[in-house]
From Swiss-Prot:
Residues 26-138, 160-372, 394-471 are cytoplasmic. Pathway: Protein modification; protein glycosylation. GO terms for cellular component: cytoplasmic side of endoplasmic reticulum membrane; endoplasmic reticulum; endoplasmic reticulum membrane. This is GDP-Man:Man(3)GlcNAc(2)-PP-Dol alpha-1,2-mannosyltransferase. GO terms for biological process: dolichol-linked oligosaccharide biosynthetic process. The gene is alg11.
Length: 471
């Protein structure tokens, strides 16, 4: 029912004559600005900023309380704005039914990021279910994208900002914002909604496969058109940049801004300290993170090396009941693989505890295929762990690469390759281990929080100048 209504609404909007549509959108946009003007004036007065210079930036991040790498990007971006642009108030659009105090407390506990709460406004969205995959059982990509357009309109209806930045990958919101407000639009893209890899992966043998390929190509064109509405686009890796450039066009203002990694504290860990023969997998408990194959590869490693003292530690956050069910599924799988005495699961560990794990484990594992970046991998390397990562995406092309001609870790693709890499990493001589740990840590200088804040701030300054030039 929801799918039918959303598609019908989309067709209705497209069917309206473009001139009439623009006129209607412009009129609605003017009303939205007038409606929010008194609220903005009150905010500026409360925080003591000059109204003529004051601006609001809307961060579109419906799952802002998830506690993962994407949320670290969001909150460090907010910190960058608060640090470098004192006249700007950050507006965070969220669908999380959690108080401002609770959200900021989790930000502090999870990421060690302190924010000025007086310069943050949370706008609570009621229609977040429209971007949930569970809402769209068929045509999921299209459904979520149409849903994001409706959710994007709800966002600017509740609070019309001066600048709009999407930090979760909802490119179709750009069309809505430009249609109703025509304000500067920025984006931080973690990964493309559809990629050229996806298009290449589908073999056109059956009729169904051909239909699916036609659907994907049509959607890729829609995605490309939506992305072209952004004024400035940041990507988290060269892999993501290349895909976005091929989809959205090379003429867009596109730059790589590596995500913030809290390396300063981790680099204080004594790299010479004795470590336990433990493999650490630091990742949100979600199916795409491939925890199942981490368990299977570890089980294979033990089949091949039954006397090994190695252990596996899985540490990650959960977003709700669905993720907790996934954790329970993983525990069941670990038991089936006879790993129950060798595997430990940790859920929603506070940052100090994560640092403790990073300081005692030997190997850091990454198993997600084509991961857009891999903040956890950088944290491994900064803390002195030897990374064993997937031979794809950001970990392959940007992170675990030779440093001054010397290796910084291992790459693997299959379960057997991972098992072999675990063995190689665990059986390096003490001198070889130390050299690789030092190389890995040295390579992390490119990914510090201060580097992200500087690079994000440079792009935000362009968006701000564009807004000032329009007034």
């Amino acid at each position: 029912m929801i799918t039918t209504l959303a598609i019908a609404l989309f067709i209705a909007v497209v069917a309206i004559h473009s001139h009439i549509r623009r006129k209607i959108c412009k009129e609605i946009g003017i009303r939205l600005i007038k409606k929010i003007a008194p609220v903005k004036a009150s905010l500026y007065k409360q925080v003591g900023v000059e109204p003529k210079l004051a601006r609001t930036v809307g961060f579109f991040h419906p799952y802002c309380n998830a506690g993962g790498g994407g949320e670290r990007v969001l909150w460090t971006a907010v910190k960058s704005v608060q640090t470098e642009f004192p006249n700007v108030i950050s507006v965070v659009y969220t669908g999380d039914n959690v108080s401002k105090a609770e959200i900021l407390r989790r930000v502090k506990n999870t990421f060690e990021i302190d924010l000025d709460s007086s310069k943050i406004v949370f706008v609570y969205l009621k229609l977040r279910f429209l971007v949930s995959a569970t809402t769209w059982h068929r045509f999921t990509l299209l459904g979520q994208s149409l849903g994001s357009m409706i959710l994007g309109f709800e966002a600017i209806y509740r609070f019309a900002p001066d600048i709009f930045i999407d930090t979760m990958g909802y490119a179709f919101t750009f069309c809505v914002v430009k249609s109703f407000q025509n304000i500067p639009v920025g984006a931080y893209v973690h990964y493309p909604t559809i990629s050229t890899d996806m298009l290449k992966s589908l073999k056109q043998v059956s009729l169904l496969a051909k239909v699916k390929m036609a659907y994907w190509r049509w959607f890729a064109q829609l995605y490309s058109d939506a992305g072209s509405h952004a004024d400035y686009v940041m990507t988290n890796s060269s892999w993501t940049r290349n895909h976005i450039a091929s989809l959205w066009g090379k003429d867009i203002q596109l730059s790589v801004v590596f995500p913030p990694c809290n390396t300063s504290e981790l680099e204080k860990i004594d790299i010479n300290r004795k470590r336990e023969p433990t493999l650490l997998y630091l990742a949100q408990y979600r199916p795409e993170k491939n925890h199942e194959n981490v368990l299977r590869s570890f089980a294979l490693y033990f089949e091949q090396h039954p006397d090994s003292p190695a252990k596996l530690l899985l540490v990650g956050s959960v977003r709700g009941e669905e993720d907790m069910c996934f954790v329970n599924h993983l525990k069941t799988l670990a038991t089936e693989l006879n790993l129950q005495s060798k595997v430990k699961f940790v859920v929603d560990a506070p940052w100090p505890k994560v640092v403790e794990y990073l300081g005692t484990c030997s190997i850091g594992v990454n198993y997600m295929w084509n991961e857009h970046f891999g903040i956890g991998v950088v944290e491994y390397m900064a803390a002195g762990l030897i990374p064993v990562v997937n031979n794809s995406g950001g970990p392959k092309f940007d992170i675990v690469i030779p440093w001054i001609g010397k290796p910084t870790g291992f790459h693997a693709s299959t379960i057997s390759e991972y098992a072999e890499a675990y063995h190689k990493a665990l059986t390096l001589s003490p001198q070889e281990q130390l050299e690789m740990r030092i190389n890995a840590r040295s390579a992390c200088a490119r990914f510090g929080e201060h580097v992200f804040m500087r690079d994000f701030g440079n792009v935000f300054a362009k968006l701000l100048r564009e807004d000032y030039s329009r007034t």
